[in-house]
Amino acid sequence: MTPEELTTSLQWRYATKIFDTEKTIAPDTWSTLEESMILTPSSFGLQPWKFITITCKKTKQDLLEHSWHQRQVTDCSHMVVLCARDGMNQKDIDKWLDQLADVRGVSRESLEGYAGMMNGFFGSMDDTQTLAWAKNQV
């Protein structure tokens, strides 16, 4: 599948009910899909998530009972588990701001207004609220 074909496919939404267990996602197509997950936007750009890709048949079988016994879990070639990150804190925000300054080629000081907005947002929430925010990002 070419990148253009992948984009066209992503624009067409469809819930697959039955997977062909004899087929797998080609490595170059999977690589493009992984890159699209990495590039997914989030609030503040913090991306408070982790993607876990499961291809092991035994692991997928073990997850079946936790997935309402939906056969798609065991029949798919690649299963992606989306995880919200718990415990977002000031260190994470500072790390993100340092990375942002580096990528944009600007000083960290030039991002102080943005930093203040982020700190105000997260400073007004407890851990439960921060986790709820992260879950909503996923």
Language-model segments: what does each one mean?
Residues M1-V138:
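Acidic, surface-exposed loops and disordered segments
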